[in-house]
Amino acid sequence: GIPYWTYNNGDEPLVAISLLDTSNIANQLDSTPRVFYLGGNPEVEFPETQEEQQERHQQKHSLPVGRRGGQHQQEEESEEQKDGNSVLSGFSSEFLAQTFNTEEDTAKRLRSPRDKRNQIVRVEGGLRIINPEGQQEEEEEEEEEKQRSEQGRNGLEETICSLKIRENIAQPARADLYNPRAGSISTANSLTLPILRYLRLSAEYVRLYRNGIYAPHWNINANSLLYVIRGEGRVRIVNSQGNAVFDNKVRKGQLVVVPQNFVVAEQAGEEEGLEYLVFKTNDRAAVSHVQQVFRATPADVLANAFGLRQRQVTELKLSGNRGPLVHPQSQSQSN
């Protein structure tokens, strides 16, 4: 669930051996190893298990689509999925351009169509990166983790009988993230509602105004259940192979299951907004937003990974300053 990149700055070839612990407590999927690439056009790393997933996906999409979008939507989806194997290749260029407030050419490069370099990219001239002092940051993180682990063992923790059991996360003043044109997001977890620690659950309330977008993101440590409580919109979910496993309109009363680490994006309809609740199977569910990942990634890494010019990298990193809630029309007007 944590995005990372590696770079060999030495004079000799580097051979790295990765151990994937699928029985880890943080893994809430199954024992099938999956690698989610944000960029490039990677080769399949686990062909035995990935082929089974691909067969199931093809069987699913070979069925009649019916009222969920029709043959035209199915053909468009299959065309998009032929371009690459990264998770961003499962989104259309138009949608990525709206989400990241970039030009169409930049959005196409983010989808990595027909990129022959696969997972490994050769950097001409080396990377120019400013390295922060990491030791102090690591020590601070260790101290914070120690303090968190000691919480609940100081004799002052709440008992189950005295725990607060209700929280209204739909209140506008309660919003954790807010965009006056796009919408708001509120969360409740064991830090704000301690009883959730015993249930191992957390919740998220999302309100999107008309055409508002909750940009592509994924849950690092939880599966989630999305329940629409008002309005209508569209939900798109992409798996580790870059396939859009779900791309449909949703309306009041409908449920959508989003597996851990699968990238998901939501957009409200043109006629009315979209309000929904997300129930997550972790009392401290963590979310990664693609925009924020790009913002934190060194410019040279983005330029080489996606084949972008410096100007394109700059506009891509600036999109991370706007947050995960986006309104396409207001972004185009700001340009």
From Swiss-Prot:
It comes from Vicia faba. Pfam families: Cupin_1 (PF00190). Keywords: Disulfide bond, Seed storage protein, Storage protein. GO terms for molecular function: nutrient reservoir activity. Residues 47-87, 102-155 are annotated as: Disordered. Residues 135-144 have a biased composition (Acidic residues). Residues 167-314 form the Cupin type-1 domain. This protein found in the seeds of many leguminous and non-leguminous plants is the source of sulfur-containing amino acids in seed meals. This is Legumin type B. Signal peptide: none annotated. InterPro entries: 11S_seedstore_CS, 11S_seedstore_pln, Cupin_1, RmlC-like_jellyroll, RmlC_Cupin_sf, Seed_Storage-Functional. Hexamer; each subunit is composed of an acidic and a basic chain derived from a single precursor and linked by a disulfide bond. PROSITE patterns: 11S_SEED_STORAGE. PANTHER family: GLYCININ G5, OS03G0336100 PROTEIN-RELATED.
